[in-house]
From Swiss-Prot:
GO molecular function: structural molecule activity
Keyword entries, A-Z: Capsid protein, Disulfide bond, Host nucleus, Host-virus interaction, Late protein, T=7 icosahedral capsid protein, Viral attachment to host cell, Viral penetration into host cytoplasm, Virion, Virus endocytosis by host, Virus entry into host cell
Pfam families xrefs: Late_protein_L1
Localization annotation: Virion; Host nucleus
Cited InterPro entries: Capsid_L1_Papillomavir (IPR002210), Capsid_L1_sf_Papillomavir (IPR036973), dsDNA_vir_gr_I_capsid (IPR011222)
Gene label: L1
Name used for this protein in its record: Major capsid protein L1
Subunit annotation: Self-assembles into homopentamers. The capsid has an icosahedral symmetry and consists of 72 capsomers, with each capsomer being a pentamer of L1. Interacts with the minor capsid protein L2; this interaction is necessary for viral genome encapsidation. Interacts with protein E2; this interaction enhances E2-dependent replication and transcription activation.
Family recorded in the similarity comment: Belongs to the papillomaviridae L1 protein family.
Amino acid sequence: MAVWQSATGKVYLPPSTPVARVQSTDEYIQRTNIYYHANTDRLLTVGHPYFNVYNNNGDTLQVPKVSGNQHRVFRLKLPDPNRFALADMSVYNPDKERLVWACRGLEISRGQPLGVGSTGHPYFNKVKDTENSNSYTTTSTDDRQNTSFDPKQIQMFIVGCTPCIGEHWEKAIPCAEDQQQGLCPPIELKNTVIEDGDMADIGFGNMNFKTLQQNRSDVSLDIVNEICKYPDFLKMQNDVYGDACFFYARREQCYARHFFVRGGKTGDDIPAAQIDDGMMKNQYYIPGGQDQSQKDIGNAMYFPTVSGSLVSSDAQLFNRPFWLQRAQGHNNGILWANQMFVTVVDNTRNTNFSISVYTENGELKNITDYKSTQFREYLRHVEEYEISLILQLCKIPLKADVLAQINAMNSSLLEEWQLGFVPTPDTPIHDTYRYIDSLATRCPDKSPPKEKPDPYAKFNFWNVDLTERLSLDLDQYSLGRKFLFQAGLQQTTVNGTKSISRGSVRGTKRKRKN
């Protein structure tokens, strides 16, 4: 028989006050039909692929570290559109609107041929190959070998108006009662800004190798003293404003090429007879006899060295245009603060140049016998970039709800727009001394006007100034022509301002044969 019972679960009531809703930029930004093209110069960098090279005193950096496994973070500075001398002033009303840039197209061009680079360590911590083992070998006091390998293959770029957020695993602070020398420390996930020069994951994970691998021999030279970061796509995709990542493209591949085992004392022993008076005896292994090589069990610290495998031009993310129609977040390509961040990783052009120099006096033609000690070997890595943009001019209405959201997102934007700024009445005349630094005149002012602080001053980026590299002539540039042709657009001039409109293609009339 059915019996009615009162509800035993919790009842959820709506909040008494409305919850703040973040609007998409498409809801309040008005896009115009005015487009600009911007492109950088050929951006080149040269350095050592594994480490920085210093002088003997250590106070001068002679050769910087430039590796194909590093992140390249370009900070593109754009001009303020509100200070443009537009030929057609009817585009916007400065009393009721402000202008901003929107990214509509992007092409990241890369020079240099495809190539595979190798990395390694002259003291790499490996005992032997454990995939095809034909003899049982236990560890000694030093089993390190000179080993090299190719890294995981990765192509990736991330576009936004704020820096890309990365994640890595870091050594955490243990509880007071758990602090014991020689024990494995706790680890925690950290979020940091990906800066120019930060190492990407090459197959050993995203972690701080400087603090978590104190033997300095578990990974290759280029990351043994570094932090390998990986973009935190989950955090950026769930960001309420979506400024760090408008869109991204990613291609990674690897396979395990070699299988090794670590040398050293095992930190976590395999459970055996030492657990609870033999409770775990013979649960994981049966010990070998005293007359066998297996009497002392070997390490179980297995690890692979990965390989990026084939590098091909058929799977390239670069040297091709990308068009932004709809971003993944609420920010649909609006470049707040007139800047754009492009984070790039590409190790498919990872060739390291080997340069040899004759160290003896005399000429090469006088050498009779080759001696390796007469030559000095150097390694160099080069990178070549060029970035092109299609920018759209947009208008923001100065309404209360729009300004409230922008103020909550970034209040410094309203300061740059100088909203409600009324200059104070100027005095009729000012005092100006000619020899202000002489002893006969008063002391000059000690507090010059403060410049606006850069919120990213403590980070390292590849700064590129595009304030004087914008053009309305889209058909004069490769990316501009692609943008016009791919959507069937045509460029017209109205009141001295070039704008884009959708053109119509009419068929050709053919004369009818009688």
